[in-house]
Amino acid sequence: RTAGHKVGAETFRNIATYCQELGIQYLTIYAFSTENWKRPKDEVDTLMTLLEQYLQEAIDTMERDHIRLRVLGDTTALSPRLQQMVAETNAISTHYQGFQANICINYGGRAEILRAARLCAESGEAWTEENFASHLYSAGMPDPDLIIRPSGEVRLSNFLLWQCAYSEFYFCDTLWPDFERRDLDKAIISYQSRDRRFGGVKG
C-alpha cells in the first residue's frame, strides 16, 4: 500500500491542477483520518513522510503560483515539524484568492462536530447554524457541491458529516491512485444531470 500512497499524492497534484483549469474553486481531499492511526506503524510513517514532502513542495511554490492550500483537522497530534509546515501553508494562503486545495489530516467528521459544539458553547454565542459552522475546520468555505468516493466504497467514512447535508454524491470503482482527469469528467457530468432542490420542490 505504500507505493499506492505515493502514486495517490501525484494523483492529487494532477487533479488539483485540472480543477484549476476547469474553474473549480475548492478541492478537498481526505488524506489521513483520525482512525488511520490504527494502521501499521510503517504505513503511518510513510504517510507522514509523504505529507511532509508535499507540504514542503507546496510552501516552495505557493507564493510563486498564488496557490491556496489549507490543512483541515486536528494538527496537535502531528509532529512539531508538520505542525510548523501546516501553520506556514495556512498563513501563506491568506494572501491569495482563487482556487483553494484542502487536505484533511487527522480529520474526523464526528470529532469536528464535537469540537465545534464545544467552541460554540464556550463562546456564549447563540446556537445558530451560522455560528456553529464558524467553528468548523472548514469555516469560511462553502459546503461541497459534490463528494466523490472512489475505490468502490459506498460510505462516507466520517468525512465532512456536517457539510455534506445537501451535497451530491458520486461513487466509482476506480482506485484513487488510478483516478484520472477523465474520471473527474464523468463525476462532473453525472453531477450536472442532477436536479438539486435543497429540500424544496422543482419549480
Locate each region found by the language model.
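Flexible, compositionally biased loop and terminal segments
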Residues: 1-203
